[in-house]
């Protein structure tokens, strides 16, 4: 550790991975112009129209705002500016903040392959299916699709008997693309590991081929997936963006 010459900040020579392993808290702070734009818009409305807007009290299930997002006319709105995302929102037609959160999580390289299945499940609930019955309680809120990192953790806990800590380790290995860990954990997920007290899917009555298929889906998904809290923070921010305009 050393102190910066241009201020009071402390700098570590360790990279972010080692800092976390040493037990230090690592936080990422985003400096977003969107926050300034929203604040300036709220001040302008108060100054010109005498209407004071409390951003913290916005109705996150306001139908007018959701309809606006569904039009795809979202230039200048955080996370919704790309043509691909605008097209996706027109297809998704979100009816709640939960839909917006899922939309942000899905529009990424890994989860993106689930978009057609998600939209079909949303519009045609009878089309939803699960690789095994144990997945239903985990994936029902997202129409049978894996959408969040937390769902990966729930799956390995419920199907294979991982502890919460072990589940977080496998989530992290997948998101960091640590292939040697991913390959090792596949065997534990399917067949278990006595030393780590992991029972495994097969011992829990889940077919070996089904278990491997579920693991493949988790690996493909988790490489680029968000955790839900991350997506929720983004969704609240983008949801706020059109509100002052309306």
Language-model-derived ranges and their functions:
Residues 242-246:
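A short, hydrophobic C-terminal helix/tail in secreted or cell-surface proteins
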Residues 3-225, 233-241:
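Mg2+-dependent phosphoryl-transfer active-site scaffold
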Residues 230:
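Pyridoxal 5′-phosphate
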């Amino acid at each position: 550790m050393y102190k910066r010459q241009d201020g009071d900040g402390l700098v570590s020579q360790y990279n972010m991975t080692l800092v976390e392993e040493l037990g230090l808290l690592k936080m990422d702070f985003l400096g977003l112009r969107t926050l300034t734009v929203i604040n300036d818009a709220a001040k302008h409305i108060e100054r010109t129209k005498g209407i004071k807007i409390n951003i913290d009290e916005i109705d996150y299930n306001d139908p007018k705002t959701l309809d606006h997002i569904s039009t795809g006319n979202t230039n200048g709105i955080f996370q919704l500016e790309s043509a691909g995302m605008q097209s996706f929102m027109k297809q998704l037609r979100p009816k709640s903040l939960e839909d917006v959160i899922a939309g942000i999580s899905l529009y990424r390289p890994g989860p993106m392959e689930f978009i057609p299945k998600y939209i079909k499940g949303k519009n045609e609930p009878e089309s939803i299916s699960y690789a095994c019955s144990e997945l239903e309680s985990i994936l029902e809120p997202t129409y049978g699709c894996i959408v969040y990192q937390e769902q990966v953790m729930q799956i390995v806990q419920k199907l294979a008997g991982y502890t919460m800590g072990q589940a977080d380790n496998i989530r992290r290995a997948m998101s960091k693309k640590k292939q040697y860990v991913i390959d090792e954990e596949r065997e534990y997920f399917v067949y278990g590991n006595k030393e780590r007290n992991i029972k495994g899917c097969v011992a829990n009555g889940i077919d070996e081929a089904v278990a491997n298929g579920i693991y493949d889906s988790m690996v493909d998904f988790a490489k680029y997936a968000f955790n839900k809290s991350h997506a929720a923070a983004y969704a609240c921010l983008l949801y706020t963006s059109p509100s002052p305009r309306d």
